Amino acid sequence: MTHPDRSAHDLNVPIQHSGRWFQDNLGRTLLLRGINVCGSSKLPTRPYPGSTHLYDDILFWDHRNVSFVNRPFPLEDAHEHFSRLSAWGLTLIRLLVPWESIEHEGPGCYDEEYIDYLRQLIEMMPRYGIKCIIDPHQDTWSRFSGGSGAPGWTFEVAGLNIKHFKETGAAYVHNTNAVPGDPLPMVWPTNYTKLASCTMFTLFFAGDTFAPHRTYQSQSIQQFLNHHFIEAYRHLAERLSDLEAVLAFEFMNEPHPGYIGLDHLDSFDPIMNLLFGDSPTPLQSFALGDGIPQTVDVYIKSWPFPTKKSHDRVINASQTSAWFSGCVWKEHGVWTVDDQGVPRLVNTHYFSKHPKTGEKISFYEDFYKPLVNRYVAAIQSVKKEYYCLVEPLANEKPPVYNEHDHHHNVIFSPHWYDLDSVFYKKFNARMTHDVQCLQRGGNVFSATYFGKRGAKKNYRGQIKNIKEDGLLNMGEKPCIMGEVGIPMDLNNKMAFEDDNYENHVHFMDAIIYALETNLISFTLWNYDVFNDHEYGDHWNGENFSIYSVKKSEEDYMRHDDGNSKLSKKHLYDGGRVLEAVLRPYAAKVAGTPVSAEFNIDTLQYTFSFIPDCKGSTTTEIFVPYFHYGNKTIKTDVSFGRCSYIEEFQTLYHQYELNDPLPKLVTITMGILTTESANSCSVM
């Protein structure tokens, strides 16, 4: 039996696609697995180490003089991290590159030092069989509106004063609020209902429609922002165009419509929006930003609904303005102040109907797709082979693509989390809820599942719906789940004390089971080299990393044998929930995948495919040393034969072309036990 000269998960192959499947140059179907690198890349490294629990009254606001060099990690550490990820079979990296990291100094001023660093980092990837996706990452628009992404100067373009966001309630920024008594982590997503974030997204996607009178340097704000965003990533694409490891550019992480499409402006829908902590209505946000104090509702965590109103409080008693030159929405007649000084809505439907025609607005059709088409065309003008990943709005179906849209090498790339467990930071495998079902109008009884099997059924169904929505709305395109993962600080961080990650393993196993049984490629969230138990991923209280430097130090000391940190034994130091993450998967398939399933309890993996590949008869399955090292592998195959090379962590399945081909080939793999000693085995 002949063997390829590389491992199953080595992606040093040309990657093309046919319909919904990625393929290599031999026509084999590729199922890609990888990781986001990394959460702390949302923050600069200079002038002081970026972390949202840190604040400097001078340096934090000096947003033009920052650097993201060494995000995600210094070049001298790259060998360690790439070696580890390759050994873990996670060879597709979604590389976070926020707009701010490229163009923080000012419009058109690119940080070539940082881009040089990225080039050197990406140049190393082929040695480890790694490819990457460039992710223009953002959360709630920018660091200065409580998230990450856009440069600070974009607020100046819109006329907003970032130093006044706290007093006016325009944004909740952890850096400026990191004192005892403030709301717990997970308050950051509420910025999607706050003035700063909503205004910037509205101007970015639809400023020409909803704010045509507000300009910057004699240009509409929308066109100014769109031009610089697209040009920044087109410039990056040019600088990276000769690097074989760059597979794709994403359009935008978790895009948001801002105010676009809101049917009314006197409240937010609590089913579609997280109300937590201070929760001003859109009208109250307008008034607060314009220096008018407001009494706003304050929400706290509850059950079965995520939050409930606890009390209210007065915001902006100082009558501070968030604007340099007046509220853009008052200027455009959305609201006014009556003779008694009370804010009043003039047109509560302003953002749901076109201001001139009165026609119903569609965010996807009128604003999102046209900009995505422009971006994709710009990126592929540099290199037509680049894939471009397009993400739907969070927890919503994707846009419907028609013949006028840019289809070439466009990939559907949704995200999915168990929002219930992420918000409460609890999981015990006894009960889970289908938040997707609830958001689509289901009731709490039909959306409740019990036990580990129930969790798997719950998640599998949700992922199936997302996949089918993509195929229906965007057409026969591959799907990469761009983000999916679990918080590691579950259940009051008990695992950090007793090192018992059993619940975490069940949680992650149920999620990856849902992905593998739906035959979806994915990049987990996330691998962060700065993760520790106290501050997690160092961004807004999140702690998702499957690697922790704190745990790495403890693991290494626990079984220090004098060998290198990169020896087989130590490559797993620092890993969290690896029992669930590291699992077999058919990476290169000589045909069309039909089904896949891994049993974490028995370590049995079953994979079926239709043997219809014309260019190769070899299927390659990643077999993690973590589970199967120094053990005898047992295989049962319905057709063909198998061999296993432990050094490559790969099980090879082959058949002869001149043999009569069956309709389906099934491969079952596990560990040889005394009970199964009579079965076929490979060493």
From Swiss-Prot:
SUPFAM superfamilies: (Trans)glycosidases (SSF51445). It catalyses: a beta-D-glucosyl-(1<->1')-N-acylsphing-4-enine + H2O = an N-acylsphing-4-enine + D-glucose. GO terms for cellular component: membrane. Optimum temperature is 30 degrees Celsius. It is a peripheral membrane protein. The active site is at 254 (proton donor), 483 (nucleophile). It is an enzyme of class 3 (hydrolase). Inhibited by metal cations Co(2+), Cu(2+), Ni(2+), Pb(2+) and Zn(2+). Not inhibited by metal chelator ethylenediaminetetraacetic acid (EDTA). One of its GO terms (molecular function) is steryl-beta-glucosidase activity. One of its GO terms (biological process) is metabolic compound salvage. It is found in: Membrane. Belongs to the glycosyl hydrolase 5 (cellulase A) family. Specifically hydrolyzes the glucosidic linkage in glucosylceramide. May prevent accumulation of aberrent glucosylceramide containing immature ceramide. This is Glucosylceramidase. It comes from Rhizopus delemar (strain RA 99-880 / ATCC MYA-4621 / FGSC 9543 / NRRL 43880).
